[in-house]
Amino acid sequence: MYKFIVYRDKNGKWRWSMQTSNGRIIADSGEGYVYKNSCIKSIKILKENICKAEVVKVDPK
């Protein structure tokens, strides 16, 4: 089971991380939010759109 953890970083900004059942972080917000509601909104947007995401293969040159 996966879960989102919402927390404040050392600068007081709100962030989220997505963790597996064993605590491994597999995704994070990548940026801090001033408002907790903005952080939670970004999780909702991700959850609504993740299944539409395209998988892109990058070939090394």
Question: What does each model-identified segment do?
Answer:
Residues 2-9, 13-33, 38, 42-46:
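A structural feature that tracks compact, well-ordered secondary-structure segments
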Residues 45-55:
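Short arginine-rich
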Residues 55, 59-61:
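Short, charged, surface-exposed hinge/linker loops at domain edges
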